[in-house]
């Protein structure tokens, strides 16, 4: 094992029994051969479960939608990339030459994906308890800063934060119709996001309100919120 990987293990607070799992977790799809995408898929599921379980225990009075919003804040790409930078994770990534030249080792989505892959690798290496312990340790500061006040955000903000947590493109809003007299108009808006096959719709007495209604409909369609808040 190289000295550099030993240093990373110290930063992560975990020593791998199977070094190949660690190396695979650090291998981007631009690199020849096997890559970390499957481990990322597994790590994402574990991260969401561990964060959800911890929030369920920490906020016993919170409603389902509030818990979902708190979790989205915890697991969003921005948060994961910040953690990854704290581990200097970019220095250890295996990237293809093109990705390396374009600065992929600094890219938020690549760093966040690699951290999720490491969570998946730890799970395969030592089981759920080891993965849970690392996730909770890494997110201690973020957990301690959360309050239910964080859930009092408008639907557009909540939708944007959810999409950012999944490293997805931001929603696109379009006014498709305006009806009524100038002093009493109704705006009709469509919200398009890549995760949904159909556009979400909203209407209101202003464009802003119609966009908020469309964003709320998108959150329900995604299964993030149930509409009974």
Swiss-Prot record:
Domain of life, per lineage: Bacteria
Catalytic activity reported: Endonucleolytic cleavage to 5'-phosphomonoester
GO terms for MF: double-stranded RNA binding; metal ion binding; ribonuclease III activity; rRNA binding
DNA damage listed as a keyword: no
Keywords: Cytoplasm, Endonuclease, Hydrolase, Magnesium, Metal-binding, mRNA processing, Nuclease, RNA-binding, rRNA processing, rRNA-binding, tRNA processing
GO biological process: mRNA processing; regulation of gene expression; rRNA processing; tRNA processing
Domain RNase III: 5-127
GO cellular component term, pick one: cytoplasm
Claim: Methyltransferase is one of the keywords in the record: no
Signal sequence bounds: none
Binding of Mg(2+), residues: 40, 113, 116
Disulfide bonds: none
Localization annotation: Cytoplasm
Residues in coiled coil: none
InterPro entries to which the protein is assigned, alphabetical: dsRBD_dom (IPR014720), RNase_III (IPR011907), RNase_III_dom (IPR000999), RNase_III_sf (IPR036389)
Domain DRBM, residue spans: 154-224
UniProt xrefs under SUPFAM superfamilies: dsRNA-binding domain-like, RNase III domain-like
Primary localization class, coarse: cytoplasm
Cofactors, names only: Mg(2+)
The EC number(s) this enzyme carries: 3.1.26.3
Listed PROSITE patterns: DS_RBD (PS50137), RNASE_3_1 (PS00517), RNASE_3_2 (PS50142)
Family the UniProt entry places it in: Belongs to the ribonuclease III family.
Function recorded in the entry: Digests double-stranded RNA. Involved in the processing of primary rRNA transcript to yield the immediate precursors to the large and small rRNAs (23S and 16S). Processes some mRNAs, and tRNAs when they are encoded in the rRNA operon. Processes pre-crRNA and tracrRNA of type II CRISPR loci if present in the organism.
Quaternary structure (record): Homodimer.
Name assigned to this protein: Ribonuclease 3
Source organism of this protein record: Pseudomonas syringae pv. tomato (strain ATCC BAA-871 / DC3000)
Origin organism lineage: Bacteria, Pseudomonadati, Pseudomonadota, Gammaproteobacteria, Pseudomonadales
Gene this protein is translated from: rnc
């Amino acid at each position: 094992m190289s000295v550099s990987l030993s240093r990373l293990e110290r930063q992560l607070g975990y020593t791998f029994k199977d070094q190949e799992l660690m190396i695979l977790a650090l291998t981007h799809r631009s690199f020849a051969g096997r890559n970390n995408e499957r481990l990322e898929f597994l790590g994402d599921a574990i991260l969401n479960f561990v964060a959800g379980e911890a929030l369920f225990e920490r906020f016993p009075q919170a409603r389902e939608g509030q818990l979902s919003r708190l979790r989205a804040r915890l697991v969003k790409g921005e948060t994961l990339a910040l953690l990854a930078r704290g581990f200097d994770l970019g220095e250890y990534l295996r990237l293809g030459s093109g990705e390396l030249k374009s600065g992929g080792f600094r890219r938020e989505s690549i760093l966040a994906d690699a951290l999720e892959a490491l969570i998946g690798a730890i799970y395969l290496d030592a089981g759920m308890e080891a993965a849970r312990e690392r996730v909770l340790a890494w997110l201690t500061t973020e957990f301690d800063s959360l309050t239910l006040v964080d859930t009092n955000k408008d639907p557009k903000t909540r939708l944007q934060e959810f999409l950012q947590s999944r490293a997805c493109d931001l929603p696109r809003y379009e006014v498709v119709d305006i009806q009524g007299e100038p002093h009493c108009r109704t705006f009709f808006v469509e919200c398009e996001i890549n995760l949904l096959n159909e556009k979400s719709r909203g209407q209101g007495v202003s464009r802003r309100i119609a966009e908020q209604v469309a964003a709320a409909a998108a959150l329900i369609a995604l299964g993030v919120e149930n509409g009974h808040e």
